[in-house]
C-alpha cells in the first residue's frame, strides 16, 4: 500500500484551518499561500508517480476549502465589536435610537457609568462575518442625536447613560427584543417589533408620547410601575398574532384612560383597579377611568392577540 500523501496534506490543512478559526488568526496573503501549497502538493505527487485514491483527494479538497473559508472571514469562534461615545463627545440631551436586526436578538438597557452616553455591542457566536454586516451611523436634527444601528447576523446590545430624553425604535426579523428601563423617566417613545421572537419591556416614564409593542410569532410582556402621558390620547398598544400578551402597568394620576383588550381564539384575564368596566367577556374587555374628552393628559391602551391569551393588570400609582 502506497503512503497516503494527499490524505496527510488534507489533514494538515484541516488542523491549520481549525486552529486559525478558533483563535481568530488572520493570515495575510493566505489565498495566495493556499494556491502555492496546493500546486506544490500536486507537483510532488506527479514527480513521485503517486496516484491518489478518491478518498484521499476528497480529504485534501475539503482541507483546502476549509482554510480558504477561514482566510476569507468564516469563523466558528465568537466575535464582539463595540462602539461607544462619552457625554463629552456627544453634547446632546435627547437621543433617538433606531435598531434593525435581521437575525439576532436586541437588548436595551441603562448604565450608571457617569461619563458614558451610549455603548453599542455586536456579538456573533459564529458564522459568516463580512464587511458591512454591522453598521452604526448618526445624524442630528432639531437638537436630537439620531443613532441608527443595523445588523444582519449579530445580536445587538445597547447601553445608555442616565439623564437623557430617549426614543427607541427597534425591529427584528428573527430574534427577541428586551428593554430594561425601570426608573428611566425621561423615555419619550418606544416602538418594538419582532417578526419571529418575543418582545419584553420594563418601562417607567413620566412623559410618554407613545408605547407600541408588536410581535407576529412570539409573546409580548409589558411591566411598568409608573406611566405618565405627555399629552392627550397617548397610545399604549400591545399587538400579537400567535403569542400571548401580558400587561402589568401603574398609571399616573390624574391621567384619563381608555382601555380595551381582545382576542379571537384565546381568553382574557384582567385585574383592574380604579376603572369603570363596561364590557368583560371571554374575548373582549373595555374599561375607562376619568374623562377622556376633557383630560389634558390621557392614555388609549389596547392589548390584543389573534391566537393567544391576553392578561391585563392595570391601576394607578399610589398617592
Predicted features by range, described:
Residues 73-144, 154:
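Membrane-interface segments at or immediately adjacent to transmembrane helices
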Residues 155-170:
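Extended Gly/Ser/Thr-rich low-complexity repeat segments
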Residues 6-48:
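Membrane-embedded alpha-helical segments of integral membrane proteins
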Residues 118-151, 180, 201-319:
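Short, surface-exposed interaction patches in beta-rich subdomains
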Residues 51-78:
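Internal/C-terminal transmembrane anchor helices
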Residues 169-206, 212:
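Right-handed parallel beta-helix
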Amino acid at each position: 500500500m502506497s503512503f497516503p500523501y494527499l490524505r496527510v496534506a488534507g489533514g494538515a490543512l484541516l488542523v491549520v484551518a481549525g486552529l486559525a478559526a478558533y483563535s481568530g488568526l488572520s493570515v495575510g496573503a493566505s489565498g495566495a499561500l493556499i494556491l502555492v501549497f496546493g500546486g506544490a502538493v500536486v507537483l510532488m505527487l506527479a514527480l513521485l508517480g503517486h496516484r491518489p485514491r478518491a478518498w484521499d483527494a476528497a480529504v485534501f479538497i475539503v482541507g483546502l476549502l476549509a482554510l480558504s473559508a477561514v482566510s476569507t472571514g468564516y469563523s466558528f469562534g465568537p466575535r464582539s465589536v463595540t462602539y461607544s461615545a462619552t457625554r463629552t463627545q456627544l453634547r446632546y440631551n435627547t437621543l433617538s435610537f433606531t435598531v434593525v436586526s435581521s437575525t439576532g436578538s436586541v437588548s436595551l438597557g441603562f448604565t450608571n457609568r457617569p461619563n458614558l452616553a451610549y455603548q453599542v455591542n455586536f456579538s456573533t457566536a459564529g458564522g459568516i462575518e463580512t464587511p458591512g454586516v454591522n453598521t452604526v451611523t448618526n445624524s442630528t436634527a432639531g437638537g436630537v442625536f439620531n443613532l441608527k444601528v443595523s445588523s444582519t447576523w449579530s445580536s445587538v446590545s445597547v447601553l445608555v447613560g442616565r439623564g437623557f430624553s430617549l426614543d427607541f425604535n427597534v425591529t427584528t426579523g428573527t430574534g427577541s427584543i428586551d428593554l430594561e428601563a425601570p426608573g428611566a423617566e425621561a423615555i419619550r417613545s418606544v416602538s418594538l417589533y419582532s417578526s419571529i421572537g418575543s418582545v419584553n419591556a420594563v418601562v417607567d416614564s413620566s412623559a410618554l408620547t407613545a408605547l407600541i409593542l408588536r410581535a407576529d410569532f412570539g409573546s409580548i410582556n409589558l411591566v411598568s410601575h409608573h406611566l405618565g402621558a405627555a399629552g392627550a390620547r397617548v397610545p399604549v398598544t400591545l399587538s400579537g398574532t400567535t403569542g400571548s400578551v401580558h400587561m402589568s402597568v401603574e398609571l399616573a394620576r390624574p391621567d384619563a384612560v381608555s382601555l380595551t383588550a381582545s382576542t379571537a381564539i384565546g381568553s382574557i384575564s384582567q385585574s383592574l383597579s380604579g376603572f369603570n368596566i363596561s364590557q368583560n367577556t371571554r374575548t373582549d374587555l373595555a374599561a375607562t377611568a376619568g374623562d377622556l374628552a376633557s383630560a389634558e393628559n390621557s392614555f388609549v391602551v389596547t392589548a390584543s392577540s389573534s391566537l393567544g391569551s391576553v392578561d391585563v393588570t392595570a391601576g394607578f400609582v399610589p398617592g
